[in-house]
Amino acid sequence: MSKINMLSLLKKLFKSTEVDLSQLIKDGATIIDVRSKGEFATGHVKGSINIPLEQIATSIDKLKSHSHIITCCRSGNRSGMALRTLKSKGLKNVTNGGSWQNVNQYK
């Protein structure tokens, strides 16, 4: 695959994610930042809720009432783990927003 085709494919993939995040936030999705409390204190998406990754599994009952959840962290790795945990516990409408800075650009 040529570099041009690869870039085109990546743009299509990321564009659809961006549109989804923007719309989810407009529709009132709850943003969960899974970084540590110290990391959260250094900067976060306004209105986001800090639930460190280690506490996600025990926070399921608090999160079930939310219509849609966007997880975020520093790079997208921990938020991906949080997404898998939440989905394994029965929550269906969960999206990994990646880094908190990525989510913040749509807020």
Language-model-derived ranges and their functions:
Residues 2-30, 37-68, 77-107:
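Rhodanese-like catalytic fold shared by cysteine-dependent sulfurtransferases
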Residues 73:
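Short cysteine clusters
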